[in-house]
A protein has these predicted regions:
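Conserved active-site tyrosine of GNAT-family acetyltransferases
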Residues: 153, 158
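Active-site acidic-Proline motif in GNAT/NAT acetyltransferases
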Residues: 93, 108-114, 145
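Extreme N-terminal starter segment of soluble prokaryotic enzymes
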Residues: 11-13
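Conserved beta-strand-loop-alpha-helix junction that forms the acyl-donor binding cleft
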Residues: 112, 137-149, 167-170
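Acetyl-CoA-dependent GNAT
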Residues: 16-103, 108, 121-122, 127, ...
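Short acidic/polar active-site loop segments enriched in Thr and Asp
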Residues: 134, 159
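Intrinsic-disorder-associated, low-complexity terminal segments enriched in Asp/Asn/His/Tyr and depleted
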Residues: 4-6
Length: 170
């Protein structure tokens, strides 16, 4: 999450999502998150991981992401390098809390650490601000797989709210 550390980031433009990009966005997400899930799985109790991902993390992510792309396309933006999608984001608005949320942020592996996530977040901040919200939230995991995401959000000025989740098998 480094601002413009690579000349490629200067050639990135943000554009609205449209359905013809669906498969490319889904493929990018799986490539971006494969190493995250590989590091996350051993850090999560096995019964929790199995319940969340009974058919594998890829199937769950594809289903969840497809629902966002189909149901909230007006809140999805792409970072494009020419005709190639370098990353994407989706936001949600929570007017009851005067808060926007960066619900999804994914960068293609070949564009990571080149400022793409920063550009997407800045665009999301502007969309959320324009909607009249006073703050923005992002959630991520506390496991080793999400370490880079935590660094990215902290470097963008996000402050953590300590939360604990506990699980018990029945």
């Amino acid at each position: 999450c480094q601002p413009y550390s690579n000349p490629h980031a200067m050639n990135i433009h943000i554009r609205p999502y449209s359905p013809e990009h669906c498969q490319a966005v889904l493929n990018l997400s799986l490539r971006a998150w494969q190493p995250v899930f590989a590091q996350m799985q051993p850090a999560v109790p096995s019964f929790v991981y199995t319940n969340f991902y009974p058919n594998g993390w890829e199937a769950r992510q594809l289903s969840d992401l497809q629902a966002v792309l189909d149901g909230e396309p007006e809140h999805v933006w792409l970072a494009c390098a020419g005709s190639e999608i370098a990353g994407w984001t989706a936001i949600r608005l929570h007017p009851e809390d005067r808060m926007g949320e960066i619900y999804i942020l994914a960068t293609a592996p070949e564009y990571q650490r080149q400022g793409v996530a920063t550009l997407l977040m800045e665009h999301a901040f502007e969309q959320i601000r324009t909607a009249g919200m006073d703050m923005v939230m992002v959630e991520t995991g506390g496991d080793p797989g999400h370490f880079a995401a935590r660094q990215c959000y902290e470097s963008a000025g996000f402050q953590p709210w300590p939360v604990a989740r506990y699980f018990k098998p029945l």
